[in-house]
Regions:
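A short, charged, amphipathic alpha-helix used as a generic interaction element across diverse proteins
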Residues: 356-368
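Non-globular, low-confidence helical/coil segments that flank catalytic cores
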Residues: 2-9, 28-322, 346, 370-371
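SH3-family beta-barrel domains
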Residues: 313-337
Length: 373
């Protein structure tokens, strides 16, 4: 009997131990899962990043701040150099981790010389060409005086910046004449939010960016060359598909910036517009998922020159000529599976669109664009 009782007791003890181990194993999984979830959240969540679009009149200057790191992209003209330096100091800047000169035109570069003299600068990124101006020589001298070298990174190079990063988009090549298409363009990223700055890059540089394998999509685009007609092509807008555009230009500037053609494109694509000539300095804060602006968009799509009537594209002329044709005519893009009422729908490039009858479009299996119909 004792032997049977011992055997039964051992069996019960073994069963109890097995049950205990199972409970502990399950408890261990329960403990580990929240830790793993926390680790995953730490990866997907981003810290705060502030982007300031400074009102430097007819010029460009953008300040970015994140987790103690600072970037200045262009510094505006001579007459606003003191303002830029003062603004940075007022916002707690003592050092600049990345000073980026998109190109060497005075309305972009002059204020950077003041920044080099006033702050501890860690890195200078600029375009790999030489300008003939005395201002350029002053810039080079200021860089050397700080014991720095001008870095000319290749397209695709990525830098860590605070809670995010930025990637070089342009220039792919350097033009011997002119400087606008030599502009250093970047995509600044923080979690799911992103910004594209292109300096004075024009259509040729934009085309090179579009033909690269880099994802150009962004939440915020600063239209190139202050909203000039020489930049912000349809193809570039369709690649960037921004929700917001921030135009940096001077009030009643002599160039007529922003151009009517550019503003018409932004309006046709329902892109929300901010303008420094109308609203002054604009600040946006990113938490990696959402954008919090210092002001509402002005959505003022009027050109800088009231007499600017824009240009009429060939496709628009064709549209007018076909108005007398029988049957409903629609517009079809070179790619895509929709047809459109107008070639300026905003969801297609009007310069590559072709016109045909609705019956022909539907026979190809195309469906009506939800924005047009």
């Amino acid at each position: 009997m004792k032997q049977i009782w011992k055997q039964t007791w051992r069996q019960r003890l073994a069963a109890a131990l097995i049950q205990l181990l199972m409970v502990l194993a399950m408890a261990g999984v329960g403990i580990r899962m929240p830790v793993q979830a926390a680790e995953k959240n730490a990866v997907t969540q981003s810290g705060e990043m502030k982007v300031h679009f400074l009102d430097v009149g007819q010029g460009l200057s953008i300040l970015a701040q994140s987790e103690g790191k600072t970037m200045i992209y262009d510094g505006g003209d001579r007459k606003t150099s003191r303002f830029v330096v003062s603004y940075l100091k007022e916002h707690g800047v003592s050092k600049i981790d990345y000073l980026i000169s998109s190109h060497y035109d005075a309305d972009h570069m002059a204020g950077l010389i003041g920044c080099l003299n006033a702050f501890d600068v860690k890195n200078v990124i600029s375009s790999n060409y030489v300008h003939t101006s005395k201002l350029y020589q002053s810039f080079v001298k200021a860089v050397k005086a700080d014991g720095l070298k001008m870095q000319h990174p290749a397209v695709g190079k990525t830098y860590k910046f605070g809670s995010g990063s930025f990637e070089i988009l342009a220039p792919k090549t350097i033009e011997a004449k002119g400087s606008n298409n030599n502009s250093v363009a970047i995509k600044l990223m923080n979690g799911e939010n992103s910004f594209v700055f292109t300096g004075d890059a024009e259509h040729e540089s934009e085309a090179a960016m579009c033909n690269s394998s880099i994802d150009l999509s962004c939440d915020v685009l600063v239209p190139g060359h202050h909203g000039s007609a020489t930049a912000t092509s349809w193809d570039f807008l369709q690649k960037t598909v921004p929700e917001y555009a921030v135009i940096s230009c001077g009030t009643n500037n002599k160039y007529g910036h922003p151009d009517k053609d550019t503003m018409d494109k932004l309006q046709s694509m329902d892109i929300q517009v901010y303008r420094t000539d109308k609203q002054g300095t604009i600040v946006v804060t990113s938490d990696g998922a959402n954008l919090n602006w210092s002001a509402e968009p002005c959505n003022d799509y009027t050109p800088g020159d009231d007499s600017d009537q824009g240009t009429q594209s060939t496709s628009e002329v064709q549209q007018e000529a076909s108005q007398t044709a029988t049957g409903e005519h629609v517009w079809v893009s070179a790619t895509g599976n929709k047809y459109h009422k107008t070639n300026h729908c905003g969801n297609m490039n009007p310069n590559t669109a072709k016109e045909e009858t609705r019956e022909e479009a539907e026979a190809q299996g195309l469906e009506p664009c939800k924005k047009c119909y």
